[in-house]
């Protein structure tokens, strides 16, 4: 069997969910061939970095505008999807090259692109939509989806109310990598009775009120803090040597290690 996993680097959550799916497929069946692609990079190779950069600037500096656009696009049911003859031609090239037995999408842009292609061409390859947001947005819904992987029972009920058959929905939670599945803290006993706080804002390090938060944590006795700034290099440079009891780290793949270490995790929604 061959599985094609499609995602997009709009934030790191969708990408990490795709990585987790690939990891689990390999664990379940070593003979399964897994191919993971960033669909935006495949469709728009010359401007994908510009698009990702613009997205990052918006969520870092204009998150209020981004949230407004996100909510309004849901209410107005505005579809933002790659379409057109040139896009279909590129999708056809990808699918003919890979010849997948199943397609798994962890970003709504990918869902819409593949669903539209299936509708136009009659492609019979099953489409699995893995919803990697904790709230439902209309962009995730596509009639051409054969199976939904829902993060919560509430989202399953929402899909059913929208007309999706219950047997086409599995409540799986958001996929996580193997390292998160065994969060044993027994070997990390806190002998000094220091309270340990982990602060992180996802892969992009989105933490707008960090000055106030770290100032408050620094003022508390017996509190040790680790801040993970992700790929936000500016934030890392600003805080890396600010407080002795606050350790600042950049992007890391080993998040589970620091979650096991912490007594409290403060992060974005």
Name each model-derived stretch.
Residues 1-4:
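Extreme N-terminal starter segment of soluble prokaryotic enzymes
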Residues 120-179:
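Active-site-proximal region of nucleotide-activated glycan assembly enzymes
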Residues 181-193:
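A short helix/loop element that forms part of the nucleotide-sugar donor recognition site in Leloir-type
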Residues 20, 24-92:
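Conserved N-terminal ligand/cofactor-binding loop architecture of enzyme catalytic domains
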Residues 260-269:
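Acidic donor-binding loop of glycosyltransferase active sites
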Residues 99, 143-144, 260-261:
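Alpha-helix C-terminal capping/helix-to-coil transition sites in glycosyltransferase folds
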Residues 89-103, 112-128:
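Glycosyltransferases and closely related glycan-assembly transferases
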Residues 191-261:
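Donor-nucleotide binding loops and adjacent catalytic segments primarily
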């Amino acid at each position: 069997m061959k599985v094609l996993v499609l995602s997009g680097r709009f934030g790191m959550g969708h990408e990490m969910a795709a990585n987790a799916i690939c990891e689990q497929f390999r664990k379940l069946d070593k003979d399964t061939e897994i191919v993971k692609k960033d669909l935006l990079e495949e469709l728009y190779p010359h401007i994908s970095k510009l698009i990702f950069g613009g997205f990052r600037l918006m969520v870092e500096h204009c998150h209020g505008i981004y949230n407004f656009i996100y909510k309004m696009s849901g209410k107005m049911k505005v579809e933002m999807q790659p379409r057109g003859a040139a896009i279909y031609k590129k999708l056809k090239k990808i699918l003919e090259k890979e010849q997948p037995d199943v397609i798994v999408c962890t970003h709504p842009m990918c869902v819409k692109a593949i669903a539209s292609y299936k509708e136009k061409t009659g492609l019979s390859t099953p489409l699995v939509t893995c919803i990697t947001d904790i709230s439902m947005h209309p962009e995730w819904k596509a009639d051409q989806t054969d199976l939904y992987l829902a993060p919560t029972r509430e989202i399953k009920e929402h899909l059913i109310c929208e007309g999706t058959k219950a047997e086409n929905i599995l409540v799986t939670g958001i996929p996580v990598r193997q390292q998160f599945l065994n969060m044993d803290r027994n070997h990390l006993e806190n002998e000094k009775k220091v309270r340990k706080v982990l602060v992180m804002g996802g892969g992009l390090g989105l933490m707008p009120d960090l000055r106030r938060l770290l100032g408050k944590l620094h003022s508390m006795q017996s509190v040790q803090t680790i801040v993970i700034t992700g790929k936000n290099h500016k934030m890392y440079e600003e805080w890396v040597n600010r407080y002795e009891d606050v350790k600042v780290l950049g992007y890391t793949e080993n998040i589970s290690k620091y979650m096991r270490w912490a007594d409290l995790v403060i992060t974005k929604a």
